[in-house]
Swiss-Prot record:
Substrate binds at T146, K169, T180, E263, N390, T395. One of its GO terms (cellular component) is cytoplasm. The record marks G179, T180 as: Cleavage. It is an enzyme of class 2 (transferase). It catalyses: N(2)-acetyl-L-ornithine + L-glutamate = N-acetyl-L-glutamate + L-ornithine. Keywords: Acyltransferase, Amino-acid biosynthesis, Arginine biosynthesis, Autocatalytic cleavage, Cytoplasm, Transferase. Belongs to the ArgJ family. This is Glutamate N-acetyltransferase. Pathway: Amino-acid biosynthesis; L-arginine biosynthesis; L-ornithine and N-acetyl-L-glutamate from L-glutamate and N(2)-acetyl-L-ornithine (cyclic): step 1/1. One of its GO terms (molecular function) is L-glutamate N-acetyltransferase activity. Heterotetramer of two alpha and two beta chains. It comes from Methanosarcina acetivorans (strain ATCC 35395 / DSM 2834 / JCM 12185 / C2A).
């Protein structure tokens, strides 16, 4: 497997484009084939999520996606669902597609009626620029950004020649479950919808569902995975393993980009729990660590306050014994051990510890010393800017 340029447009059979005008944006991706999706588990579910989930569950295929930024079309009642349907109809009419094979996604402010007339007005401009160049993938990724500071796209080519590419957005209201983000992934492998669905659920659970920026789960999250089947390559059993691994690699890359791009963030936190009795124990603890406002604040302040880490693990619901815990902080290939088998370690190199805490990417490793299961999660520090951004979001 190798990383390649081009984002989703590196995949045969995918054309895309997007425009961004102020806070409003439109993305269109044209690619036809079997498809799978996972969606937010927030019980306050946005209209486009309801529509797109219905498309996936009934058709198991997609012909296109239309997405807008600037308005979530959430908590908008029947009018909101009609607006989502109108978005699908506008695209299907323009491209001569069946409307029940078009997925719709929205991101932005909750509780405000979507201006569909604005979308209809600017849709022709988007469609005129549909293409398969790397620039088209970038334009599509840019148009769905809200408070994101960085574009999020990635593509790989497997040894068998199959390609997978994805774009995503997300920087705030992020604790996927599924959620808080949008991701559109494509492959040219000759695979049916059930294979896509199985690979997607495994990959999402290990990656996007392990990201915490602020602990809030959005109303609009979705990940859609479509195969154009254009490579003509049907992966063998061995290649299917590589296919799943490649999807996990792609989503891990995007998940880390989301965490690093968290609203106001200055540092990426990677937390690892090892030596747990069960995977669920490791998962509970590691997500509690990256979710903890006290841990996140300490990382922002370059404060090696490791007590907050063990406290978060302790209240997470995971089974652990404090006399078995070992804890270290790492960055740039260097590590400082802070706790060993329940005993506080004497840190002789304070300069190294300070150097680690000043790094932009910090790894926290907590070993339970009880088993062989492990889990990894990603988050970011909690800064003054996070409060400012969200205090001023609608005002």
């Amino acid at each position: 497997m190798k990383k390649i340029e081009g984002g989703i447009c590196a995949v045969k059979g995918v054309t895309a484009n997007g425009i961004k005008l102020g806070k409003m944006g439109i993305t269109v991706i044209r690619a036809e084939g079997p498809a799978a999706g996972v969606f937010t588990k927030n019980k306050v579910t946005a209209a486009p999520v309801v529509l797109s989930k219905g498309v996936i569950e009934t058709q198991h295929q997609l012909s296109a996606i239309i997405a807008n930024s600037g308005n979530a079309n959430a908590f908008t009642g029947d009018d909101g669902f009609l607006d989502a349907m109108e978005m699908a109809s506008a695209l299907s009419e323009s491209l001569d597609l069946e409307p029940d094979t078009v997925a719709v996604a929205s991101t932005g402010v909750i509780g405000r009626r979507l201006d569909v007339s604005w979308i209809r007005e600017h849709l022709p401009e988007v469609l005129e620029g549909l293409g398969s160049s790397p620039e088209c993938s970038l334009a599509a990724a840019k148009a769905i950004m809200t408070t994101d500071k960085a574009l999020k796209e990635v593509a790989v080519e497997l040894d068998c020649g199959v390609r997978i590419g994805a774009i995503a957005k997300g920087s705030g209201m992020i604790e996927p479950n599924m959620g808080t983000m949008l991701c559109f992934a494509y492959t040219d492998a000759l695979v049916p919808a059930d294979v896509l669905d199985a690979a997607l659920r495994i990959a999402v659970d290990k990656t996007f569902n392990m990201v915490v920026v602020d602990g809030d789960t959005s109303t609009n999250d979705m990940v859609l995975f479509t195969s154009t089947c254009k490579s003509g390559i049907k992966p063998c059993m061995e290649c299917l393993d590589e296919f799943e691994d490649a999807l996990i690699y792609l989503f891990t890359d995007l998940a880390k980009k989301m965490a690093r791009d968290g609203e106001g963030a200055t540092k990426l936190i990677e937390a690892r729990v090892t030596g747990a009795k069960t995977y669920e124990d490791a998962r509970l603890a590691v997500k509690a660590i990256v979710r903890s406002p006290l841990v996140k604040s300490a990382i922002f302040g370059k404060d090696p306050n490791w007590g907050r880490v063990v406290a978060a693990a302790g209240y997470s619901g995971a089974e652990l014994e404090q006399e078995r815990l070992s804890l270290s902080f790492s960055a740039g290939g260097e590590t400082v051990e802070l706790v060993k088998s329940g005993e506080i370690s004497r840190v002789s190199d304070l300069a190294l510890l300070n150097k680690i805490m000043a790094n932009e990417e910090i790894i926290i490793t907590l070993d339970f010393g009880m088993g062989k299961e492990s889990a990894t999660a990603w988050g970011c520090d909690l800064t003054y800017d996070y409060v400012r951004i969200n205090a001023e979001y609608t005002t």
